[in-house]
Amino acid sequence: MTNQTCKAAVLTKRHTIEVMDVQMPECGRDGMIIKLEAASICGTDLHLFEEDPAYPVILGHELCGRVVEMGPDAAKSMRCYTGEVKLGDRICLYPWVVCGTCENCLTYGIGACGVCDN
């Protein structure tokens, strides 16, 4: 576990979000650390805001930022439609894992992947 911290908007109780210092995650072999420049809370997160999850919770999975650390296998495991992701790249994260080549992806868009479990 790293000793570094970063700021995060944390849901601490129902309808209460606080900016807090949180422990930075470790970068896994096939992962990357992204320094966030912008993030949003999606409509799919609202059930956590309205219900009582196991607090504290960091909401949001739609984000953009700069890649500041990459595991040794990250470039192989991350699918990027514009080429290989490199250290220092600015990226927008699309949080679905899709094939991008099946009939549903090609006909209806990648949100309708027929191969992956979305």
Model-derived regions, located:
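Residue-level detector of conserved, well-ordered beta-strand and adjacent loop positions
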Residues: 12, 23, 68, 117
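Short structural boundary motif marking the start of a folded domain
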Residues: 2-9
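Phosphate-binding beta-alpha-beta segment of Rossmann-like dinucleotide-binding domains, i.e.
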Residues: 95-118
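Well-ordered beta-strand positions in beta-sheet-rich domains
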Residues: 19-21
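Cytochrome P450 core scaffold surrounding the K-helix E-X-X-R motif
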Residues: 44-48
